[in-house]
């Protein structure tokens, strides 16, 4: 029998879709939701399920940014064949995304047991939500928001890509929150920071989802819940991406900072009263 039923998969898929690209921690929200629904958050099958439905959210990025991705991949292909094409920013950017993914892959494989063990604690999630909100607020205040997407460099990509490790080790910190905060500190504007976070998430999250697929299927999650959760994640994430890009073009990240603190304190309360464990 599957440890997650179709109804629960719909809820979790929606939570994943809404929160994956918002700087509020999808992992934290999934763990809270799983706990409230009585799903064992530390079960290998559940951890695998959470990683697999991320692929739906990533598919939404691929569809939403299809023209940009085709342009970048095409430039990369032309550059591989012709040296004269290698000065184009899109060619360089494709390599930067690849290089910037290497650190999180190394840490993810090396620290897998730690990440899925002690660091998966809801106490860690709560603390990371609150601490991460402080980092995000400081980054938004410090950043001069003067550099656009075309101004990004190899250094930017590596620093922003490496910051994903924070969310890997401290679920609740938020991959989007870590990458956007780092980009803001590097003086990228909010839209450029958000778009860079999207592109850097494609290889990292896709790889994690495919890697965990065997655990999800082999240890207690049925095909139907996986499929439903992934599809719901895709649909909801597409809408979330569209909304976020419009929001950051006109607003600061303060709303996310406040929301993270509220959720972090709420989670501490639920843990302290024994509602969640």
From Swiss-Prot:
Catalyzes the dephosphorylation of undecaprenyl diphosphate (UPP). Confers resistance to bacitracin. GO terms for molecular function: undecaprenyl-diphosphatase activity. The chain crosses the membrane at residues 46-66, 95-115, 119-139, 165-185, 191-211, 216-236, 256-276. Bacitracin is thought to be involved in the inhibition of peptidoglycan synthesis by sequestering undecaprenyl diphosphate, thereby reducing the pool of lipid carrier available. It catalyses: di-trans,octa-cis-undecaprenyl diphosphate + H2O = di-trans,octa-cis-undecaprenyl phosphate + phosphate + H(+). It is found in: Cell membrane. Its main location: membrane. It is a multi-pass membrane protein. Its EC number is 3.6.1.27. Keywords: Antibiotic resistance, Cell membrane, Cell shape, Cell wall biogenesis/degradation, Hydrolase, Membrane, Peptidoglycan synthesis, Transmembrane, Transmembrane helix. NCBIfam families: PRK00281.2-1, undec_PP_bacA. The keyword Membrane applies. Pfam families: BacA. This is Undecaprenyl-diphosphatase 1. GO terms for cellular component: plasma membrane. InterPro entries: UppP. One of its GO terms (biological process) is peptidoglycan biosynthetic process. Belongs to the UppP family. The keyword Heme does not apply.
